[in-house]
Amino acid sequence: SMLTAKTLTSVIGNHETMDKSDENGPTTYYDYFSVPSHGYIDTDERIDPRGESYFAMDYGDVKIIGCNWNEGKDDPSFATGSKQLTWLDEQLTNADSKWIFIFAHVNVYSTSYHGQWSASQKEYIAPLLEKHALAGKHILVFGGDEHNFEHLYKAGVHYLRPGAMNGSNRDQYNMVDKPYSLMFNKIAGFSTIDVSESGEKVKLIARDRDGNEFYSYEFTRSGGLKPSLYITEPNGNNDPVTDSFKIKWTCFDPQGTAKINLYYSLDSINGTSIVTGLSSDIQAIDSYDWNVRNLQPKGDYWIYGTIDDGVNAPVRAYAKGKVSVVWDTTPPPAPSEFTGNFVDGRITLSWKNPVYEIPVNI
């Protein structure tokens, strides 16, 4: 069987901390799973004396780190200064493997249902991972909880939810994280992760429950950190606009040389250029005023952008909302200070232009 032929490891989930009383904690999990020790028994943070809910081990070219980012009463803290976060920082700092795989049941980023409750993970975990990614660590973070597949990327860190065989039919729900999502699929399935013999590449293949491939991605060490782009406006309110709309974004560009291009589209695929060649220096520019008054046809437009550093393949990112371009039905203001006179057979009409506030004579 697979259990006797393959090396398996696991991380504790939210339900494992809900099965016993306060005195016993998640004992059922430790009855059936054995995990490595991180070097000490953290009784102050309520870790079962028979095992660790966060651990690390080396496996070939990969450093495997298991974390507990649940927030139940029997779970260790991961806030700033906590033993778990300090330990994780040390593990990442000292890791000399080609890849770092981090496993945790709860996700840092997710567009599915539970993503709306990951504020603490974003506050404490994400900055730490991004710091080490910027320092040259190649980090893949694997999560669960949602019972579906998703691949997200933010600031040099890939976040993967490989799927669940049972599935949940949960659609994308947490649109706050939509700018980071590269692929989402709610069907039941599973994923395989293969590290190349040289250790320079990692291949992800996602399949449905029948084994049919629906997504693949190759992670490489040679390309360096990819830039990433996050369009923050439009943000999903779909406010109607008649004249211009301010598109806003933030981005991650470790080399500082990438260029940003913006596009609009009615079908989210076949885009038309808005502007090209914008700087990735968000201190200099992080918005663009898009003139839509003469745009035809009127309607709801997708906005997306690409960021290209000239080394990696351009990264495309969609805004989580659309821009609703509508006709301006506001009647023009009437002219003011209207006068007329007749002198020497000539009629002169005068008024003040209400738009430009200047006198007009004919």
Residue spans of the language-model regions?
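Short, compositionally biased P/S/T/A/G/V-rich stretches that sit at domain boundaries
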Residues: 166, 208-209, 218-245, 325-341
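Extracellular recognition modules
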Residues: 205, 302-306
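Short, solvent-exposed loop/turn segments at the edges of extracellular beta-sandwich modules
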Residues: 308-314
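Extended active-site neighborhood of metal-dependent phosphoesterases/phosphodiesterases
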Residues: 1-89, 93-96, 120, 124-140, ...
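Pro/Thr/Ser/Gly-rich low-complexity, intrinsically disordered linker/stalk tracts
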Residues: 328-360
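Extracellular acidic, Ser/Thr/Pro-rich low-complexity tracts
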Residues: 248-256, 309, 353-359
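Surface-exposed, short loops/turns at beta-strand junctions within beta-sandwich domains
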Residues: 294-299
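A short C-terminal boundary segment appended to hydrolase-like catalytic domains
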Residues: 182-232
